[in-house]
Amino acid sequence: TRTLKKGDIFISVIGDRNGHDFVAEAFKRGASAALVAYKPNNVSANMPLLIVEDVRIGLEALASFARKRFKGQVIAITGSVGKTSSKDMLALVLSNFGKVNKAEKSFNNHLGVPLTLVRTPPDSDFLIVEIGMSNKKEIAPLSALVQPHIALITDVSEAHLASFNSVVEIAKEKSDICLGLNKRGHCVVSRDSNEYSRLVKYINEFGVNIISFGENKSSMYKLRKTVIKNNKTCAEAVLQNG
């Protein structure tokens, strides 16, 4: 309820705390409705309650509707490092070309991703979604929900080895972000990554276009140099068309 705005729908997620305990407070703060699995005892039956069997499934249904309604470009970002910073930098650049909506903070899990979709104004030109993982088979369903036009894999490292047996498994999981891409979609990958070749192998299984970037001379978009000046980072790059 802390971030609730007047007119918002309150999602009563059951996690470490039961969101149903805060429905009454949400209505006091101006919520237009609440998505719940049951009616809380301290809430009148006359209040606008959207009662579903499972709040998480209900949230995903709302997110799916929001995605189908959205007509702008969708970019999904994953990787072992740099997801949030990449999201913020990309949002800054794209703001010169239209209205941008991006995931708040690190909203990148099974709750944060659908919340991002639901909160996206339908008149936005761009939506940037961050997709993270803690365990196996988490990225694919989120990519299917998001249906991005462009996917970005920042890098693959040993950051998730607590849940995976090897970096190979992590690379495979990260490549699953391509599941939601259509055949004309693009996956952007760092050519400087130690796992680049492995990522390309897995990404090719989805039949999407691969765009590489980095300092490696074989990069499609090659970074020549970066300079920090007047509290700004300036980059010089060679684009594919020169």
Over which residues does each language-model region extend?
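N-terminal leader/targeting and accessory segments in enzymes
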Residues: 1-61
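ATP-dependent carboxylate-amine ligase
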Residues: 3-9, 14-19, 149, 163, ...
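Short, polar loop motifs at secondary-structure junctions
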Residues: 34-42, 191-194, 215-216
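Adenine nucleotide phosphate-binding catalytic loops in nucleotide-utilizing enzymes
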Residues: 49, 167-168, 201-204, 208-242
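Hydrophobic residues at beta-strand termini and immediately following loops
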Residues: 52, 103, 213
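Phosphate-binding loop of NTP-binding sites
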Residues: 57-191, 195-206
